[in-house]
């Protein structure tokens, strides 16, 4: 059976902005509010919520991080062809 996970993410074009957002989140800023304000991904409108997805559904670099990083700990920035991601895994099965 395939592994599944649920995650939030913020996607931006600039690494500097991603680093700044990660620092804000680690200092207590609301992930969802920052996603709504800054994310260029359509999921930003939902606070960065990607919902539940199966391992292998996302681009390989994103998939690798989601299925290996600590749950509920903001991680990043991760660079993909889409830009820079800040990721927060909500759960993994």
UniProtKB/Swiss-Prot annotation:
One MF term in the entry's GO annotations: peptidyl-prolyl cis-trans isomerase activity
Keyword Cytoplasm in annotation: yes
Gene3D superfamilies xrefs: 3.10.50.40
Cysteine disulfide links: none
Regulation of catalytic or functional activity: Not inhibited by cyclosporin A or FK506.
UniProt keywords, alphabetically: Cytoplasm, Isomerase, Rotamase
EC top class, as a word: isomerase
Domain PpiC stretches: 2-91
InterPro entries per record: PPIase_dom_sf, PPIase_PpiC, PPIase_PpiC_CS, PpiC/parvulin_rotamase
Matching PROSITE patterns: PPIC_PPIASE_1 (PS01096), PPIC_PPIASE_2 (PS50198)
Record bears the keyword Cytoplasm: yes
Catalytic activity, EC: 5.2.1.8
Catalytic activity: [protein]-peptidylproline (omega=180) = [protein]-peptidylproline (omega=0)
Subcellular location: Cytoplasm
One annotated Gene Ontology cellular component of this protein: cytoplasm
Record function comment: PPIases accelerate the folding of proteins. It prefers amino acid residues with hydrophobic side chains like leucine and phenylalanine in the P1 position of the peptides substrates.
UniProt family annotation: Belongs to the PpiC/parvulin rotamase family.
Protein name according to UniProt: Peptidyl-prolyl cis-trans isomerase C
Organism: Escherichia coli (strain K12)
Organism taxonomic ancestry: Bacteria, Pseudomonadati, Pseudomonadota, Gammaproteobacteria, Enterobacterales
